[in-house]
């Protein structure tokens, strides 16, 4: 078995993926399978933090299009990520592995506040750190949150888990001629307008020299495979 390429990473999970085959809510079987993948990856000797989205509950942009102000809609979306964060933390803990939920919002009855010190401590103690609440500020996506948190905690890469095996020139489900890229620079990803992450996330990754690895999480063990450099995906770096 190949040695891991990285020793500390941030994994970005979409809220929509946590819904599994449903259009809304949390599919426990999907959450449990992701928990298994994270635990197996951690056993490779890797420190893992996870940023979860909230699109399976609330999407701030969609709510704001219905008359709610954008800051309020985004706050609703960020609170939805905390629910997903708690669900994933609980699934990991039920399987006997240590996990720590941290939120960008002060909510002591629910979980600890995210600080760099708290994240470093939890990772050093061997916990899988699950991050909710986005950045705590409106107008920023959870993709940007993942890059921001990775830079803050000194992670070596961001693993962007999706339902496709990398970055394509077009939607491969709609265009059979779509080309998959093995590598892109951050600037190429921004200029190409690829929808896998927003431009702010790519720009911050470029500024902080953080590689982003885009891969499909559909197959069990995909996270560990990518960390060993054995999986199929797109590396965005340089």
From Swiss-Prot:
ATP binds at residues 12-15, 55, 59, 162-163, 168, 171. InterPro entries: AceGlu_kinase-like_sf (IPR036393), Asp/Glu/Uridylate_kinase (IPR001048), Uridylate_kinase (IPR011817), Uridylate_kinase_bac (IPR015963). Keywords: ATP-binding, Cytoplasm, Kinase, Nucleotide-binding, Pyrimidine biosynthesis, Transferase. It is an enzyme of class 2 (transferase). GO terms for cellular component: cytosol. One of its GO terms (biological process) is UDP biosynthetic process. Pathway: Pyrimidine metabolism; CTP biosynthesis via de novo pathway; UDP from UMP (UMPK route): step 1/1. NCBIfam families: pyrH_bact. Catalyzes the reversible phosphorylation of UMP to UDP. This is Uridylate kinase. It comes from Bradyrhizobium sp. (strain BTAi1 / ATCC BAA-1182).
